Structures are given as C-alpha cells and as structure tokens.
Amino acid sequence: MDKASATANSHEADAFSRKAAELVARHRIDPAALVDRDHDELAVREISLGRGAYVRGRLSLLTAVAEAHDARVVFASTPTGTVAYVAGHVSDLDVVEVMYTSLHAQAASQMSAVRRTTGAATQRYRRSFLFGYADRVATSFEDARTAAAAAAP
C-alpha cells in the first residue's frame, strides 16, 4: 500500500492496490490462521470522517474496505463531524485501518488533480469520483478474495 500511495500515476497505484488486496485475501484464507483465530479478540475502532461534501463518499470507501475484511461499519453525526465505528476482529481492523487510510490518500490525490469550470461542478465530479472509486475498490477486493479462495488447497 505504501507503493500505491507514493506514486502519482493512477494506473500504477491501482495495480499496487490490487496486488495488496490479493495478498491480504490470500493470507486471510490460510486455514491455520482461521483455526487459530481467537473469537474473544473482537473490538470497535472509531474513525473520524470529518465534515463536508465528501463524507458520504469516504463512508462508502470505508464500508467497502471493512466489508471485504469481515468488519461492519456504523456511523454517527457529532458536533465535530461524522464518526464511523468499525467492528470486527482486531487483526481485521488493523488491515481495514491501513487499507482505508492508503486508499483514501490515493483517491484524494486523484481527485485533487481534476478541476471543472466551476467550484460546484468540481465538487460534483469529485463526489461522483469517490463513490465510483469505492465501488471499484469493493469489486477489486471481491475479485481478489474469489481468486484466493479458488487457489486455496
């Protein structure tokens, strides 16, 4: 994910992100890891999504990442902005946090590179982009998980 975040090329970032998703999916399907999983290690993490025009898009991205890793998301509006609560196994939450942070940085970088003729048009484009990006991420994770399951012994 570090390589994906470090590049300015969106195609290269996408390739690195797909590879990271593939590696995570492959290691999640390891039967030894599933047997050793301690069901008492459930937790809830709080992730601030802030305020503004892109909160729902950020929530959509976080949900796509969390659901791909068997975690669930709920959110609340607070006086300081929107807060998401992600529930799942601690090891899954660690992955969700890293993946979401990296993917959000990549999306922000790609969104900031585009300007439309007006501020409102730019905002609409960026909002649409973020929802589409979240959908593409969800599809990528699902494809990686399916491939890892097919390759598992």
Each model region followed by its residue ranges:
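Short, charged, amphipathic alpha-helical segments
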Residues: 12-19
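Short coil turns that connect the paired helices of HEAT/ARM alpha-solenoid repeats
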Residues: 6-8
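Long, charge-patterned amphipathic interaction tracts in eukaryotic proteins
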Residues: 25-153
